[in-house]
Amino acid sequence: MSLNPNGYKLSERTGKLTAYDLMPTTVTAGPETREFLLKVIDVLLDFVKATNDRNEKVLDFHHPEDMKRLLDLDVPDRALPLQQLIEDCATTLKYQVKTGHPHFFNQLSNGLDLISMAGEWLTATANTNMFTYEIAPVFILMENVVLTKMREIIGWSGGDSILAPGGSISNLYAFLAARHKMFPNYKEHGSVGLPGTLVMFTSDQCHYSIKSCAAVCGLGTDHCIVVPSDEHGKMITSELERLILERKAKGDIPFFVNATAGTTVLGAFDDINTIADICQKYNCWMHIDAAWGGGLLMSRKHRHPRFTGVERADSVTWNPHKLMGALLQCSTIHFKEDGLLISCNQMSAEYLFMTDKQYDISYDTGDKVIQCGRHNDIFKLWLQWRAKGTEGFEQQQDRLMELVQYQLKRIREQSDRFHLILEPECVNVSFWYVPKRLRGVPHDAKKEVELGKICPIIKGRMMQKGTLMVGYQPDDRRPNFFRSIISSAAVNEADVDFMLDEIHRLGDDL
């Protein structure tokens, strides 16, 4: 059932009221407030139902200028009636991509976990900040419990962690802590007292946020040394050591190495143990960006060899809003050493972080972070963990990997139509669709160019039809190819078949 903006009617009286006629402005408006909110919930629940209906479109696509004409985006000078606000809610969701739809394979973060969603509703209702225990006591304690559990899963008995607004900021916290650990005076004196130029290392398949750290923190992207990867997308560790020695010979100071556990495009896992050996040899901080692949830490079947040696890292980024299915946003950064976060980022603002409070101020988290205020991202994860249990998360990871194997099987069974690019380590499946005119043509670089031209055409048709969303992109070895992501618990084998069949229907004539 598509959402009909005109299908959600408040009573005639309530519909004519404005927000000023509801609580808290009008304290006696309990019945009207309840009627309004229940109608909003009707809209939300219908969207949940539509999201899980395979007969519904994934999206109703319109080009930006056309979309502007369909929507009333004006922000008025005077308050609009409540009925209009209800229609605004329904209209917004009518044209929103259903990222929880079983035929949405487009992004790393997809799915609509209803327990996590319920947690986000409660979080919005509580509307509290996460910088001190005095205003968020329950949520601060939840955060401690969940993050301690995640560090134990990594393999650490102590340490410290924080929830950050996305994997990019989590990686930034790792960079800042690494620099502070090696040069604690940098916080006060900046680069003036450094004995040389700092350099960091990461693979050419890393998330762009690693280079962004170098830019944001004044290192400069020229000093973020890119290490080549092999044909599977893994960092070539011999090249890492060669480049470290090369920069040391120039007088530079290697201090930070990023290993990626689940690259964005190919889903590759760098060789953590070998990189840890190199970091130990040359006294470099080892960070693991497991924003994408971190969920597999919970699977005894798939944890090794992908994460063998993870406990040797100094810091780990892990995003539950990806493979674990928590709602956006839910990103964590973990440190082996306790006390680094507070030492690195503390500014001791006396209007927030007084030392003479009536409770243990070690529970105040605001001075650990550069943000001050933090959104409450913990409750939805805590509630989801309670609902699934650690065993449930493990089963979820195993099921996603099982579906990937099913997709590989179906691709191999249709080898005339599909060309698998490589065996995936994660839930990223990279492939080309081969239309009728190119079947039987020997596979070479020239054919790959033609296959690459087909991807954006099929994606365009896909979006116009609205039945499916699968991403595509090039990399440094290949022209455009499809990259499907199976990270939603809603997906089953029939959905994988639909994906491949629909790509064939949309592209066979090209």
UniProtKB/Swiss-Prot annotation:
Source domain of life: Eukaryota
Any one biological process term the GO annotation gives: larval locomotory behavior
KO phenotype (gene knockout): RNAi-mediated knockdown in 5-HT1B+ neurons leads to dis-inhibition of male aggressive behavior.
Matches recorded under CDD domains: DOPA_deC_like
Keyword annotations from UniProtKB, A to Z: Decarboxylase, Lyase, Neurotransmitter biosynthesis, Pyridoxal phosphate
UniProt-listed Enzyme Commission number(s): 4.1.1.15
Stored InterPro entries: PyrdxlP-dep_de-COase (IPR002129), PyrdxlP-dep_Trfase (IPR015424), PyrdxlP-dep_Trfase_major (IPR015421), Pyridoxal-P_BS (IPR021115)
Chain positions recorded as substrate binding sites: Q107, L108, S109, R483
GO molecular function: glutamate decarboxylase activity; pyridoxal phosphate binding
Keyword Transferase part of the UniProt annotation: no
GO cellular component term, pick one: cytoplasm
Modified residues (N6-(pyridoxal phosphate)lysine): K322
Subunit structure: Homodimer.
Similarity section: Belongs to the group II decarboxylase family.
Protein name: Glutamate decarboxylase
Gene: Gad1
